[in-house]
Amino acid sequence: METDLQVVRVPITHPDAQALIEAVQAEYVARYGGQDESPIDPADFEEPLGRFYVGYLDGTPVATGAWRRSSVRALGAQVTAEVKRMYVVPTAQRRGVARRMLTHLEATAAEAGIEAMVLETGMKQPEAIALYTSSGYEPIAGFGHYRGSELSRCFGRRIA
């Protein structure tokens, strides 16, 4: 389903970004019993290290997505980026918003010279796993903060 999603680059500290990050953290509490505590440095989402985006439908912030350069080597790529903070508010789900955001992240990362995207998602997020696998992501070894976590699944995809 097509959407009229407007994807806007913003700092992670932007009020719309912060409101949506709070919403996804509440979702993590509901699903896992606690917030995502992976280390996040706002500078990781500024050039040249990464980007942060908010998606708007009819002027309303409904989604976030970001990428940051990563030291993870996967799928034969020398230059990778990690997808972070993918989230769509419940009222905008099942409308293609997440797929549009993911496509935007991949395109902007490729423009910045990224060869592959890597990411982590949780076992209690089957809709996220379905999005990533249907978008061509394949399982990779756990990495970083999530290495060894039984609730985490890591994926990667060559984009260049």
Name each model feature, range by range.
Residues 2, 10-14, 112-118, 122-160:
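C-terminal "cap" of GNAT-fold acetyltransferases
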Residues 2-84, 89-91, 102-104, 108, ...:
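Acetyl-CoA-dependent GNAT
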Residues 89-91, 95, 123:
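Active-site acidic-Proline motif in GNAT/NAT acetyltransferases
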Residues 94, 107-111, 138:
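Conserved amphipathic alpha-helical interaction elements at protein-protein interfaces in regulatory
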